């Protein structure tokens, strides 16, 4: 599997984008930095979008993706929970603000809702996909992808303390998880997020449960704290003896 990081930050600027990952150029995981990071041709080549939860920084570019596809009369399946679809239609895709692409055009809606929930398994874009529940401030799904050659990617989306028990239901080769704030802001836990210190605790628990540490790619870092978080994550890697790194915007990684 090839993983391309379209957005790896909890903040948007010229140099940073909200969360979005692209797997093998065809499957988008979350849509925070989707259209902002893809050419029109790359957007038209997407086979599906999977949305893990309703927060704005994970759904923002559904509004622009839908419009670009509408112009070309394309349809795409959007895999998300019923709760996420309802939130989108009440807010971002409310006709008072934009276009409800789940309903328009009436004869062939741009977005085809494919409902998912924790425990769901499906075959998607040549991968076996399994959804797990992860602890966050709103209902959130983690995504395990298994390729035909047996390689596994686990994308946890946003999650906070006690996440390791969910992670341990998988045996990933690459774990993509979050660190939002530095250790100086322990209140991150109150909002369902991790600091480097909290990440270290979850990884130690994962190793206790599973007997190994996967390679770890850290996303969702607030860009104002990037240097501080990077230094603290490097210290975690040294302490645990693991391969743990901050994801680069636009970075491409082999799983």
Residues of each region from the PLM?
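Acidic/polar short surface loop at catalytic or gating sites that assists cofactor/ion binding
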Residues: 75, 79-111
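Cap/insert and terminal regions of metallo-dependent hydrolase folds
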Residues: 160-251
């Amino acid at each position: 599997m090839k993983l391309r990081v379209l957005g790896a930050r909890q903040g948007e600027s010229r140099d940073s984008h909200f969360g979005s990952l692209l797997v093998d150029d065809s499957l988008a995981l979350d849509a925070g930095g989707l259209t902002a990071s893809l050419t029109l041709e790359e957007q038209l080549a997407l086979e599906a979008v999977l949305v893990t939860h309703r927060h704005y920084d994970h759904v923002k570019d559904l509004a622009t993706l839908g419009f670009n596809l509408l112009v070309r009369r394309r349809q795409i399946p959007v895999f998300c929970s019923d709760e996420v679809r309802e939130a989108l239609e009440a807010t971002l895709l409310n006709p008072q603000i934009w276009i409800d692409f789940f309903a328009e055009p009436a004869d062939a809606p741009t977005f085809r809702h494919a409902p998912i929930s924790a425990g769901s398994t499906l075959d998607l874009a040549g991968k076996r996909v399994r959804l797990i529940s992860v602890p966050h401030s709103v209902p959130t799904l983690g995504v395990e992808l298994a390729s035909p050659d047996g390689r596994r990617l686990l994308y946890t989306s946003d999650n906070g303390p006690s996440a390791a028990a969910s992670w341990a239901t998988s045996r990933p080769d690459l774990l993509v998880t979050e660190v939002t704030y530095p250790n100086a802001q322990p209140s991150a836990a109150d909002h369902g997020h991790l600091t480097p210190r909290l990440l270290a605790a979850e990884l130690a628990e994962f190793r206790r449960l599973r007997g190994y540490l996967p390679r770890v790619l850290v996303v969702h870092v607030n860009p104002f704290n990037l240097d501080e978080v990077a230094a603290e994550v490097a210290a975690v890697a040294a302490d645990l003896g693991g391969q743990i790194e901050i994801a680069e915007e636009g970075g491409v990684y082999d799983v």
